[in-house]
Amino acid sequence: MTVKQTVEITNKLGMHARPAMKLFELMQGFDAEVLLRNDEGTEAEANSVIALLMLDSAKGRQIEVEATGPQEEEALAAVIALFNSGFDED
């Protein structure tokens, strides 16, 4: 099964190196695959910092987060919480 939720990027600088690394590190604790998709359809796997940086995700963009795997619910909730916290940057 797959779970999805859309979240808005709220931190001032969007997805840059520090938030990408935080998201990558967060995903290491879950048995789930997480895919992010921007409003133009560009996709990035959360376990790839380079892909996350290429997602073109500036402040205000909507990102769909999709999780699949044994811990998909927990992984999705953790990713959404990280986005909602502004990656602890603001």
Curated annotation (Swiss-Prot):
Keywords noted in UniProt: Cytoplasm, Phosphotransferase system
Cellular component annotations (GO), alphabetically ordered: cytoplasm
Alphabetical list of PROSITE patterns matching this protein: PTS_HPR_DOM (PS51350), PTS_HPR_HIS (PS00369), PTS_HPR_SER (PS00589)
GO molecular function (one): transferase activity, transferring phosphorus-containing groups
Domain of life of the native organism: Bacteria
UniProt keyword annotation of Hydrolase present: no
InterPro entries: HPr, HPr-like, HPr-like_sf, PTS_HPr_His_P_site, PTS_HPr_Ser_P_site
Extra facts: Enzyme I of the sugar PTS has been shown in PubMed:7876255 to phosphorylate NPr of the nitrogen-metabolic PTS, though much less efficiently than it does HPr. This process may link carbon and nitrogen assimilation.
Protein name, as recorded: Phosphocarrier protein NPr
Organism: Escherichia coli (strain K12)
Gene label: ptsO
